């Protein structure tokens, strides 16, 4: 029964694959929980810096920092693109890249030059053939990236802004809504659109050393760095949740395939047995 042997081989192969995808699903679920914890832990940091900057800027409105000045006409833009290093996470990266490309095409149609920085192997491989100026590449950050890992890359882009090479800097990443929903997002970093601060109708009467302007400049850079890091940890949360869902779907599909093949195998085996019985009966009748 050659057909039956082939089917049994297929069933065995699919079951082995099912074990692998099931294990990957459990690993992704564990990593997703840790990534979500890091994401939630980093949010208060951004909010606190935003609050301090809001009070400081309100108290010293005479400061006109370049990072807080709005543009009259946009001629160049820089985008920090955050993706995963690994695949097997559904359409997470593809959806983000399509969203970014639509924006890039729109910018270029309006005569706006686009420079990019890629974080993650998938973004690096995808965008290297689109003729965009890649100012920096950062990969292999792992599942638990440190804040300091991003500083060099962010500095390159901010230096481009300071030198006038780019007039606007944004970060593109997948925003984590919940386990099932991840939203491709492009968030403007500089010029800073708005700084949210509670109770902004008063300001703190502090003495700043060396002076308030230098403190504000340092905090603005730190705030931008914190926003990029927040985007990175959110993207990692999206990656792990997407991978968990993709592996669960693969595991379920493997189970369905095994059931179908087992049904086909049983039918083929039943047909073979029926044929053998018929041949035996026919042979007996002929002998009589």
From Swiss-Prot:
Localisation: Cell inner membrane
Family: Belongs to the ATPase gamma chain family.
Entries under HAMAP family matching the protein: ATP_synth_gamma_bact
GO biological process: proton motive force-driven plasma membrane ATP synthesis
InterPro entries: ATP_synth_F1_ATPase_gsu, ATP_synth_F1_gsu
Protein name as annotated: ATP synthase gamma chain
Pfam families according to UniProt: ATP-synt (PF00231)
Single GO MF descriptor: proton-transporting ATP synthase activity, rotational mechanism
Reported function: Produces ATP from ADP in the presence of a proton gradient across the membrane. The gamma chain is believed to be important in regulating ATPase activity and the flow of protons through the CF(0) complex.
Gene for this chain: atpG
